Amino acid sequence: MFCYQCQETAKGTGCTLKGVCGKAATTSAAMDLLLAVSRGVGIVSDALNRAGAAKDEKEIGHFLCDALFCTITNANFDDADILQRVEKGITLRNRLVKLADENGVTLPERAELRWDGSKASYAEEAKRQGVLRIANEDIRSLKELTIYGLKGMAAYYEHASNLQQEDLTLIHFMAEALAIVADPEADQATLIDLVLRTGQAGVKAMALLDKANTSAYGSPVITKVNLGVGSNPGILIS
């Protein structure tokens, strides 16, 4: 395994045996597969978007947000649950590939589209799809920075969506960003621009979540509360 997505990572360079957070190597491998499948879905979805082809936007958005959110630190360490998402993603990716073929949409040659998703190949495919698959450290860092931005954006979007607030332009951006991350020819200039655009999209997602929360619960106001100690059990809300 190799993971350096949080500031607590081992020696400040990356966890390679087990995560400081407690994440097992098998869980890290499952997450690498899920991210690879997400890139595959993103590649095809982005190509369909550019061609103006109709598709199930809600299903794509739900999968991408759920998959990316699932891989943030301490969100989900259940290997079987993560691998179920991998299977779901493979099914969605294959369906989108078929849709692209039916609409005459040409897809790029990418490793994320070649893997057949067979369970017997999980372990080997995870090794090929990890963070270190990218040799150039600068390119790797820019792509990973984008991915971490997308993960945060996915979390905001999923919470907003649960409160009936959605914005398909953000889902389209996720697909585009994943497609660029999957492109082995993407250069530093392209990726620096992508990082900045990811930040802009993240702010837009935060605004969407704020709208969702205030629409559902109202705007926060200064309120007096009891700071005393009670006799019954309570819940601390920060």
Residue ranges: model-predicted function:
Residues M1-S238:
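Metallocofactor- and cofactor-centric catalytic cores in central/energy metabolism, strongly enriched
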